Amino acid sequence: MQILPAIDIKNGHAVRLVKGDFEQETVVNDNVLDQASIFMEAGIQYIHVVDLDGALEGRAANRDLIAKIKEMTGLAIEVGGGIRTIEQIEDYLSVGINRVIIGSMAVKHPQFVKEALDKFGSDKIVVGIDAKNGMVATEGWLETSTVDYISLALEMEKMGVRLLIYTDVDRDGTLTGPNFEHYEKLIAHLTSAKVIASGGIHALSDLQQLEKIGVAGTIVGKAYYNGDISLKELREFEG
């Protein structure tokens, strides 16, 4: 199972939120490039980067900083937050970003995902499904749709998406453990798409359980920043 430490960027800093609430923001590192270097030096291979300003504004707000992370560290990077146009995706891929995550647009304009898949391929395009009580949340989690997470996942899989990131918003940043039941259900419904888990991870035992369920990767944020799981443990777990 792949482990992806997370860097959430807001106002140029690495931050953590609780349940996606921008009022509950903690700066975990003033210097995003420094944080990326810490991951690189620990032997981490792949990181998950979220442009929170971008998610709120619907644009690639921290694009230059993210391009700098790639240039400086050479880490494999997936990026999400504010992806609304094909040009943005093209731009991120052109500076060496490995995967781009489409979130809100998958719910509001599914055709956009199809267009991105046709142009860039399923290894470059990831769909992020964020849910509150099983219903998909959009626009930086400020809005909740009437679509449930399984329906959206199946629609995306049918379209050709091969990698989904599922975040349980109610667990994100809470350190209360992932919603294992949701992952089991999701994986049972899918036939070809793989799932990356995100939200609520608080101990190595969570990672073991997710691996057992059949999750392809896990994003780790607060558990690392709080000191509950070390980078050494994450590296060893990944093998």
Curated annotation (Swiss-Prot):
One of its GO terms (biological process) is L-histidine biosynthetic process. It comes from the Bacteria. GO terms for cellular component: cytoplasm. The keyword Amino-acid biosynthesis applies. Pfam families: His_biosynth (PF00977). Pathway: Amino-acid biosynthesis; L-histidine biosynthesis; L-histidine from 5-phospho-alpha-D-ribose 1-diphosphate: step 4/9. Gene3D superfamilies: Aldolase class I (3.20.20.70). CDD domains: HisA. Signal peptide: none annotated. It is found in: Cytoplasm. Its EC number is 5.3.1.16. Keywords: Amino-acid biosynthesis, Cytoplasm, Histidine biosynthesis, Isomerase. GO terms for molecular function: 1-(5-phosphoribosyl)-5-[(5-phosphoribosylamino)methylideneamino]imidazole-4-carboxamide isomerase activity. Coiled coil: none annotated. The active site is at D8, D130. It catalyses: 1-(5-phospho-beta-D-ribosyl)-5-[(5-phospho-beta-D-ribosylamino)methylideneamino]imidazole-4-carboxamide = 5-[(5-phospho-1-deoxy-D-ribulos-1-ylimino)methylamino]-1-(5-phospho-beta-D-ribosyl)imidazole-4-carboxamide. InterPro entries: Aldolase_TIM, His_biosynth, HisA_bact_arch, Isoase_HisA-like, Isoase_HisA-like_bact, RibuloseP-bd_barrel. Belongs to the HisA/HisF family. This is 1-(5-phosphoribosyl)-5-[(5-phosphoribosylamino)methylideneamino] imidazole-4-carboxamide isomerase. It comes from Streptococcus mutans serotype c (strain ATCC 700610 / UA159). The gene is hisA.
